[in-house]
């Protein structure tokens, strides 16, 4: 077996050979692809076997997933010291999880008595009958695994789950927050059945019968339910805790019988995850184990501020479990942790590792769900895997949101004072003050302000390099070879959202290399992508490419070389199969239940018209040719065969489709005038914060954290993507946000980029050749020294200034000066920038690049009301097209759109 160094050397040699081939591929996306080349490309796209291994914790990876030469995402060279929670797993549960059907018959023959005992089968059962019953247990266990887990959990998990009506693979998707709750009484209320943890206070047979009587468990096997109940009651430390309190109660009942009748029965409580530092002289537990302590108090005084408490009383109320509680995970997922035990908590750390830092929840989860050769029930639990991955991520995000809520001032959220003032003015209350305010900063990944910031950064790329030429949508193919090769026995791709996310990430990186470094569609000047998720959670990426001027797509011939919208001929059967499988849209009267159908019309505007020649029209995507050449492909819908021709083909590129065997839609967008709407589509998100009035209308509350959570949808592939901290957006160039004075805390003397710019102009005559926004292309900003330094590497950064309202005239004119004067030493007025309406034209022209029609009309109204332009009529006529472009786009009628926009402008 080769050593790690030998393996690394072999991989590097392969990469060198591949890079040599890549140099020949510049623009090869414009070639006709042969059958032989299609097969060669598919082999190049193969990620290889998952045979790379972390030397510390033995997690398995594709070689392309390594971070540098030695780092992996699993253990951070220290987390391997965390005890393996699955090391001593009950044998019968392990067999149920692994469902090794192939070896079952032989194993039962050889060890019949053992299997009869493990699965509580009748003593006289023969091997054939035992095999049949156990195989039925396997099927039932995995079909209803979420129900079995919920039935045996000590704590409940609840949230709004999304229901899917149409057929498709399983997807667990939640909307809003997830809650974990524990019954706070040992016995149920009168005439109610015990639930969750209360079931462990009754005997096994009764508990199993109660579980089976629940409507949700009607399809579960009573025998399997009883079997799992007996295992959990025998193994779980939480079940042991319930026995402790039962023993203490029985002991106190006997003592009370012998005591003075006037003495009240003592108060008995059980506390999970109890504080080890409790004063033992004051709070002396009657019994204790590793997760719980039972207290008896004659005066009713028990420890306070404990997370989870169970009282010796009847009731139906629940206590919420904090996400920081170390028992939460084991209480919610008894099938994964049948022995109980502790999970992540804020104080978790590894001695002498990670430079003394505590282990984050994200690191803990990544380590737990990494793929290894050792047994891990999480990765073979199919539907329950979806649930716990979503639960993991929601908990991680909840921790981050809590930090933001508690540290608003430290995070300089006072930068958003203008928003608070606006809310005060709009409140109309006798006490118009902002109440509990939580503003999500732009650093919160996935939040509305994060997406808006990156949309503005993307528009800065457009101002620097021009409009994008190609809009590529790359969708994950769950049937990729790499996914299927690494499925465990009896699994389907939908059962492994972790594999789906990992393979898609690796393929996306490879695709971006082909597009940007190799340039298979042409030489690229700038690029960006955003990762999103389909309704059922399948990941896809929206990619925008800005081509070099020498590779721009300008003629119908250029369109034909890059994009095709026709079914390939039978000469290349492999490509034909790829296109007919991935790139043919199917809807219409023969398939009215297709997701794209609304009011019996396809929202994607299929079928298209037959076109003999490609066209490039201003204002829309280029239209590739769709010849009526007789090529068709068959689809079966609801038992009926329908034939689809070139009118139903989604535009694609032969090279990319051949290599990646996936849905890769390639659209030529260079002719679109209102390109900002393409960027708006790519950077979808919340446009504004939700606002909520208090019940007494006395104060107005702005809680962006709650609004974000309430509006959020999370599926398992997305949750896994975020747990692994993969980028949800990326672009070719960094964008330096350049400050104005308002963004600088008036109480601080620290320099901003603006002050550093002024200092740079004094110290470096070379810098006076550049505008403020051009400085980041030639200088880097040193955060520590608060000054600009000459850039040593190739330019991969551009500058962007925040947009300033004309109402704030001092900042507006400062910004105007910085945008149009190199090395400024005079005011905007002295420069002659304010002598006519030119500053308003500049403002509207800049805003039209990234603001919507609605926002532009509001800006135009502000100019009219606040700035009194000398010629407002001509100013309106000059920008009438952009002021009305949203309504023209919606109505598809120029005159009507302009009328609606003008009416709105009058009411602004």
Please identify what each model-predicted range represents.
Residues 1-908:
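Extended, structured polyanion-binding interfaces
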């Amino acid at each position: 077996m080769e050593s790690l160094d030998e393996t690394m050397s072999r991989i590097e040699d392969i990469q060198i050979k591949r890079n040599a081939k890549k140099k020949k591929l510049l623009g090869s996306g414009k070639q006709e692809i042969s059958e032989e080349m299609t097969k060669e490309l598919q082999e190049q796209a193969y990620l290889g076997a998952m045979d790379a291994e972390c030397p510390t914790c033995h997690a398995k990876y594709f070689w392309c997933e390594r971070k540098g030469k030695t780092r992996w995402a699993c253990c951070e060279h220290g987390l391997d010291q965390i005890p393996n929670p699955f090391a001593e797993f009950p044998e019968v549960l392990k067999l149920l999880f692994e469902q090794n059907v192939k070896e079952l018959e032989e194993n039962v023959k050889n060890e019949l008595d053992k299997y009869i005992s493990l699965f509580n089968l009748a003593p006289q059962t023969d091997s054939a009958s035992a095999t049949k019953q156990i195989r039925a247990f396997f099927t039932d266990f995995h079909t209803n695994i979420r129900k079995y887990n919920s039935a045996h959990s000590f704590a409940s998990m609840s949230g709004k789950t999304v229901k899917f009506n149409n057929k498709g693979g399983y997807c667990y998707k939640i909307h809003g927050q997830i809650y974990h709750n524990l019954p706070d009484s040992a016995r149920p209320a009168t005439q109610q059945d015990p639930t969750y943890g209360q079931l462990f206070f009754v005997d096994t047979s009764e508990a199993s019968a109660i579980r089976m009587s629940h409507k949700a468990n009607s399809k579960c096997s009573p025998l399997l339910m009883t079997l799992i109940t007996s295992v959990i009651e025998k193994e779980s430390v939480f079940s042991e805790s319930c026995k402790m309190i039962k023993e203490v109660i029985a002991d106190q009942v006997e003592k009370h019988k012998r005591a003075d009748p006037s003495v009240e029965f003592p108060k008995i409580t059980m506390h999970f995850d109890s504080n080890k530092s409790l004063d033992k002289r004051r709070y002396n537990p009657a019994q204790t184990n590793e997760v719980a302590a039972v207290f008896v108090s004659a005066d009713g005084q028990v420890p306070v501020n404990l997370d989870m408490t169970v009282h010796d009383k009847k009731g139906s109320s629940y206590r919420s479990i904090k996400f920081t509680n170390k028992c939460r995970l084991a209480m919610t997922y008894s099938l994964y942790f049948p022995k109980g035990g502790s999970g992540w908590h804020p104080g978790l750390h590894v001695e002498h590792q990670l430079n003394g830092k505590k282990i984050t929840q994200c690191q803990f989860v990544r380590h737990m769900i990494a793929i290894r050769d050792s047994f891990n029930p999480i990765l073979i639990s199919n539907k329950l895997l979806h649930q716990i991955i979503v639960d993991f991520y929601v908990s991680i995000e909840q921790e981050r949101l809590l930090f933001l809520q508690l540290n608003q001032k430290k995070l300089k959220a006072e930068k958003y004072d203008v928003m608070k003032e606006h809310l005060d003015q709009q409140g109309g209350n006798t006490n118009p003050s902002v109440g509990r305010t939580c503003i999500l900063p732009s650093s919160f990944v996935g939040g509305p302000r994060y997406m808006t910031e990156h949309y503005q950064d993307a528009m800065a790329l457009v101002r620097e390099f021009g409009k994008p030429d190609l809009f590529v949508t790359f969708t994950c193919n769950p049937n990729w070879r790499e996914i299927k090769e690494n499925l465990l026995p009896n699994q389907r791709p939908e059962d492994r959202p972790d594999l789906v996310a990992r393979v898609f990430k690796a393929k996306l990186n490879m695709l971006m290399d082909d597009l940007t470094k190799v340039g298979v569609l042409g030489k690229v000047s700038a690029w960006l992508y955003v990762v999103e998720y389909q309704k059922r959670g399948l990941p896809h990426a929206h990619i925008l490419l800005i081509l070099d001027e020498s590779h721009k797509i300008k003629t119908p011939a250029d369109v034909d070389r890059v994009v095709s919208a026709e079914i390939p001929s039978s000469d290349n059967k492999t490509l034909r199969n790829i296109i007919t499988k991935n790139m043919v849209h199917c809807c219409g009267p023969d398939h009215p239940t297709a997701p794209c159908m609304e009011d019996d019309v396809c929202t994607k505007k299929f079928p298209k018209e037959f076109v003999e020649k490609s066209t490039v029209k201003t204002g829309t995507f280029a239209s590739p040719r769709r010849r009526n050449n007789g090529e068709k492909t068959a689809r079966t819908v609801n038992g009926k065969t329908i034939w689809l021709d070139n009118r139903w083909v989604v535009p694609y590129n032969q090279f990319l489709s051949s290599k990646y065997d996936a849905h890769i839609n390639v659209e030529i967008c260079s002719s679109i005038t209102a390109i900002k709407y393409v960027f708006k589509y790519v950077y979808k998100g919340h446009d504004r914060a939700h606002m909520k009035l208090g019940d007494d209308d006395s104060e107005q509350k702005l809680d962006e954290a709650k609004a974000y959570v309430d509006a959020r949808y999370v599926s398992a592939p997305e949750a896994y993507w975020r747990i692994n901290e993969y980028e949800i957006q990326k672009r070719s160039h960094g964008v330096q946000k350049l400050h104005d004075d308002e963004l600088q805390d008036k109480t601080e003397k620290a320099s901003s980029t603006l002050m550093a710019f002024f200092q740079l102009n004094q110290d470096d005559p070379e810098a006076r050749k550049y505008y403020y926004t051009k400085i980041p292309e030639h200088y880097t900003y040193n955060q520590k020294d608060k000054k600009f330094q000459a850039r040593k590497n190739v330019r991969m950064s551009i500058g962007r200034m925040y947009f300033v309202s004309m109402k704030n005239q001092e900042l507006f004119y400062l910004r105007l000066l910085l945008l149009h004067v190199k090395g400024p030493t005079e005011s905007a007025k002295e420069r002659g920038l304010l002598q006519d309406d030119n500053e308003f034209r500049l403002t509207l022209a800049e805003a039209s690049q990234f603001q919507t029609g609605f926002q532009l009309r509001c800006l135009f109204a502000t100019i009219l009301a606040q700035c009194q332009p000398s010629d407002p009529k001509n100013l309106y006529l000059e920008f009438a097209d952009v002021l009305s472009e949203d309504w023209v786009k919606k109505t598809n009628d120029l005159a009507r759109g302009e009328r609606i926009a003008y009416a709105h402008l009058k009411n602004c």
